[in-house]
A protein has these predicted regions:
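Active-site cofactor/cluster-binding pocket
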Residues: 1-197
Length: 197
């Protein structure tokens, strides 16, 4: 999984929370954050591998199966689809747009859309979308159970009121994500697709 976000949105923390939930559910994980001296708002990425076998590879993920994008404007700056595996990629995107308003490359076969910024402003009063997008990821992929994901929040990062707010954020992200499955057929990279809702 490759997480894309901006500094301050919590992409690295999102990967850490998901990693903990995956371990609880019996998976092996390997996480690699990727950030330098970027300021708040600059593009950042985090990488998370999981498997039912020990993972030895510790590099960045250049050919992701899944992409989680925490920011609806990031695609203007970063090619979030770079390296996505052909005809099996999954995109979980923070956006208020509908599927018909987005340009999705043909190598993506499933898309989860969540208006995470609106939810974040409602829950937190600012656009921190990481836990909301974890809920969206679970809705789109069933990678872990929703209960497991919310149960590890207190162990990884949050306490008291912040814990309650982030549990609500995950649940709302899960509930308000719209999942689209795109029919699998061989397409060239130049072709466009019409999604089925």
């Amino acid at each position: 999984i490759r997480f894309h976000g901006r500094g301050g949105q919590g992409a690295v923390l999102a990967a850490k929370i998901l990693a903990k939930a995956l371990v609880v559910e019996g998976e092996y994980i390997k996480g690699v954050p990727s950030f330098g001296f970027e300021r708040r708002g600059a593009p950042v990425a985090a990488f998370l591998r999981f498997d039912d076998h020990v993972i030895r590879q510790t590099t960045n993920i250049y050919r992701p199966d899944w992409i989680v994008c925490l920011d609806p404007t990031l695609f203007k700056t970063v090619d979030i689809f770079e390296g996505v595996k052909e005809h099996r990629g999954i995109l979980v995107q923070a956006t208020a747009k509908s599927m018909n308003e987005l340009t999705i490359p043909p190598r993506i076969v499933k898309v989860g859309l969540c208006d995470a910024v609106r939810i974040a402003l409602d829950v937190f009063g600012r656009s921190i979308t990481n836990t909301i997008m974890l809920g969206a990821l679970v809705r789109t992929t069933d990678v872990v159970s929703l209960d497991c994901l919310t149960s590890v929040l207190g162990e990884v990062a949050f306490r008291d009121a912040a814990l309650d707010a982030n549990v609500e954020a995950i649940r709302r992200g899960y509930q308000q994500t719209v999942v689209h499955t795109i029919p699998r057929r061989m397409l060239s990279d130049e072709e466009t697709i019409t999604p089925h809702v």
